[in-house]
Amino acid sequence: MNGNKIRTRFAPSPTGYMHVGNLRTALYAYLIAKHENGDFLLRIEDTDQERQVEGALDIIYNTLKMTGIHHDEGPDIGGPVGPYVQSERKHIYTEYAQKLIDKGEAYYCFCTKERLDMLRENSESLGRPHKYDKHCSHLSKEEIEENLKAGIPFVIRQNNPNKGTTYFEDEIFGKITVDNSELDDMVLIKSDGFPTYNFANVVDDHLMGITHVVRGSEYLSSSPKYNRLYDAFGWDVPKYIHCPPIMKDSHSKLSKRNGDASFQDLLEKGYLKDAILNYIALLGWNPGTTEEIFSLEDLIGKFDYKSINKAPAIFDNKKLKWMNGEYIRMFSLEEFHKLALPYYKGVITKDFDLLKISELLHTRTELLSEIPEQVDFFDELPEYSCDLYVHKKMKTNFENSLESLEKALPVLESIDNWNTETIHDSIMELIKELEVKNGIVLWPIRTAVSGKKFTPGGAFEIAEILGKEETLKRVKIGIEKLKNEINQ
């Protein structure tokens, strides 16, 4: 390892889907490394064996591969500082925990669950934050050996002082100082022999040469304890980059426990991976310009972690949808058509020109999953209310809509060469003859051929795709519906 090289890591737990916050952490860590031609590592933190979910590891690998966040070292490709799975490094943590015990920076704790529960209840009844009372830190060497020999279950705890202060520097939040009296003697090694996240991440970050640690701001409160571990070992502290939380709104955090969208959920809703990644990059960071559309390569060039905000970032679904539309419009018609085809299945079964439908949708689509509801009227005219014919801006009502359709019907019947251009020319000639505004005729025709308030494209384009026979049939249905409505 090059001592001057920036090394970052993404260290997820295989506990389910890839949450938006986790993906942002991976992206920022990747960008920080690649901006300086550094190394980006993948490490799997599976010390909490009970929370592991089958298939979660595949989700991690697939998400990183799909988004182009490629790691230089990791469990699947190896590297000089492996293993890269924490459960395979158990012996390392035990060794380093023993070093802390020898230094007086950690101790064995034999307290039962009942005693710990009682301590917690006492703290709650007094309205104080729960903190272990150092009961086992006073055990003699003989008592400890006796308990170990008897096979009494134990954990290993960090031995934090009660007096003085500890501070740490964060690249985003600056210098943060805490009273040592507030620091709990956190568990380093659990009773099952596995390390806690809090201990393993410090040991691994040092042994793997991590120079910049990217994580959520919820870990700010644990950082003084991490610093005390670094100091106890005599290790250099990496640069801390704590990112602001991603909020659902001004009151609540985006959370997978509350069922908020994961990366997989967003893909299933029809969002594009590049749009998602671009949007996530802007949740807490901005380039200092009004520019908003960035490829991954653009981000590598522009990303500066010093521009990450302290303030929480709001996950704005409308903004993501807008950005997704921008990405869709960057596709060629052929590329968009390929993406749209699966969404036509089951909705369009008749022999329509699907490429022409894609042409209408291309610049009007923001979300791929909305395609079915935009095109379902092609196969079958939906049941619709005559109220659709009434449009304030177009100045249409039942009576003038009926008149327009009755005048348009013979004009449409007379067209031999059925295409958008001829339909357009014929109807525009009619409008000229009638000396009315375009909307007076076009709105009723569009309503009659689609049965919908919103359509991809106007009356002419829809009529061409439907074909002459189906268009005439639908206009006649519209005439009958309006007559019945007026004569009621």
From Swiss-Prot:
Bound cofactor: record note: Binds 1 zinc ion per subunit.
Motif window: 'KMSKS' region: 253-257
Required co-factors: Zn(2+)
Record bears the keyword Protein biosynthesis: yes
The reaction(s) this protein catalyses: tRNA(Glu) + L-glutamate + ATP = L-glutamyl-tRNA(Glu) + AMP + diphosphate
Subcellular location: Cytoplasm
InterPro entries attached to this UniProt entry: aa-tRNA-synth_I_cd-bd, aa-tRNA-synth_I_codon-bd_sub2, aa-tRNA-synth_I_CS, aa_tRNA-synth_I_cd-bd_sf, Glu-tRNA-ligase_bac/mito, Glu/Gln-tRNA-synth, Glu/Gln-tRNA-synth_Ib_cat-dom, GluQ/Sye
Summary of the function given for this chain in its UniProt record: Catalyzes the attachment of glutamate to tRNA(Glu) in a two-step reaction: glutamate is first activated by ATP to form Glu-AMP and then transferred to the acceptor end of tRNA(Glu).
UniProt family annotation: Belongs to the class-I aminoacyl-tRNA synthetase family. Glutamate--tRNA ligase type 1 subfamily.
Protein name per the record: Glutamate--tRNA ligase
Organism: Clostridium tetani (strain Massachusetts / E88)
Gene designation per UniProt: gltX
